[in-house]
């Protein structure tokens, strides 16, 4: 089987860091990830308080709705700027697919982590030091189980991105990919909220951990997504992508 376009790595070069398009894209990832984490964490705090006696299920459902909306809106808003990744797992998975160079992906990840950290630190200031929700394993869920769960959730996330955004033969109308991705994030949050919190995003987990100093099992939220995401990209390419129908190449996410 020939090496397919979606499974090619491109190293890139340091000069990319000074290209105007790259600078705009990195700034976009910082800004949109900041907004994503700020709204996401704030909504989780609010959902927990509002649920009150309704219990954990109501809080998870409310948080899932908020996550779905904020991902759909901000991924759409940032799509033409940087691709609207908002997530190191998405960025590194797309690097595996050759849609972004490894050098630029490193800049994206740094910007995403910075945006997440700033969002959580600001939120702690605005809430008077109120407890910041941190992704953690539920009782009875071990680290290996947590990694597996996060890998599966992130696998589905990247599979949807491949099918609705990257594949030129996609059935989804143009521009609806980020919306469908947001809906999937909401569904995964409901499914995995009571297990691992269904992060699917190392940056989303990093900011709260940094702001609170709670690092227990934090590595789970890196290993799981970074295993599941790239696997989905490779699997989609090998199993479902028809290179001849696609004209021999995928349409890369916009980088400028």
UniProtKB/Swiss-Prot annotation:
Specify the protein's topology with respect to the membrane: Multi-pass membrane protein
Name of this protein: Probable aquaporin TIP4-2
Example GO biological process: water transport
Which organism does this sequence originate in? Answer: Oryza sativa subsp. japonica (Rice)
Q: Which UniProt keywords apply?
A: Membrane, Repeat, Transmembrane, Transmembrane helix, Transport, Vacuole
One GO cellular component term, please give it. Answer: membrane
- Matching InterPro entries: Aquaporin-like, Aquaporin_transptr, MIP, MIP_CS
Primary subcellular site in the record, as a coarse category:
membrane
Q: What does this protein do?
A: Aquaporins facilitate the transport of water and small neutral solutes across cell membranes. May be involved in transport from the vacuolar compartment to the cytoplasm.
Q: Which family does it belong to?
A: Belongs to the MIP/aquaporin (TC 1.A.8) family. TIP (TC 1.A.8.10) subfamily.
Query: Cross-referenced Gene3D superfamilies, in alphabetical order?
Result: Glycerol uptake facilitator protein
**Which Pfam families does this UniProt record tie to the protein?**
MIP
Q: Which compartments is it annotated to reside in?
A: Vacuole membrane
Record's keyword annotation contains Iron: no
Q: Where is this motif: NPA 1?
A: 87-89
According to the entry, what is the taxonomic lineage of the organism? Answer: Eukaryota, Viridiplantae, Streptophyta, Embryophyta, Tracheophyta
The record's annotation in PROSITE patterns points to: MIP
Tissue specificity statement from the Swiss-Prot or TrEMBL entry: Expressed in roots, leaves and anthers.
Q: Under the GO molecular function aspect, what terms does this record hold?
A: water channel activity
Domain free text: Aquaporins contain two tandem repeats each containing three membrane-spanning domains and a pore-forming loop with the signature motif Asn-Pro-Ala (NPA).
Please indicate the residue ranges that the annotation assigns to the motif NPA 2.
201-203
- Report the gene name: TIP4-2
Residues that span the membrane, as ranges: 25-45, 59-79, 86-108, 146-166, 178-198, 220-240
């Amino acid at each position: 089987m020939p090496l397919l376009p979606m499974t090619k790595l491109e190293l890139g070069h340091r000069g990319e860091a000074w290209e105007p398009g790259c600078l705009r894209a990195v700034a976009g990832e910082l800004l949109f990830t900041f907004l994503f984490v700020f709204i996401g964490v704030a909504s989780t705090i609010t959902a927990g308080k509002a649920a009150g006696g309704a219990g954990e299920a109501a809080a998870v459902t409310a948080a899932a709705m908020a996550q779905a909306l904020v991902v759909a809106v901000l991924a759409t808003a940032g799509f033409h700027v940087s691709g609207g990744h908002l997530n190191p797992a998405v960025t590194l998975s797309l690097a595996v697919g050759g849609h972004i160079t490894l050098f630029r992906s490193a800049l994206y990840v740094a910007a995403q982590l910075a945006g997440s950290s700033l969002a959580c630190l600001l939120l702690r200031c605005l809430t008077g030091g109120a407890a910041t929700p941190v992704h953690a394993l539920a009782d009875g869920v071990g680290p290996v189980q947590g990694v597996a769960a996060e890998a599966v959730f992130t696998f589905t996330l990247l599979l949807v991105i491949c099918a609705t955004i990257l594949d030129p033969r996609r059935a989804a109308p143009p521009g609806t990919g980020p919306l469908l991705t947001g809906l999937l994030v909401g569904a995964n949050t409901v499914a995995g909220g009571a297990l691992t919190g269904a992060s699917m995003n190392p940056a989303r987990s990093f900011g709260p951990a940094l702001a609170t100093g709670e690092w227990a099992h934090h590595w789970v939220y890196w290993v799981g997504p970074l295993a599941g995401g790239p696997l989905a990209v490779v699997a989609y390419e090998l199993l479902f992508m028809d290179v001849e129908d696609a004209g021999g190449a995928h349409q890369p996410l916009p980088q400028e």
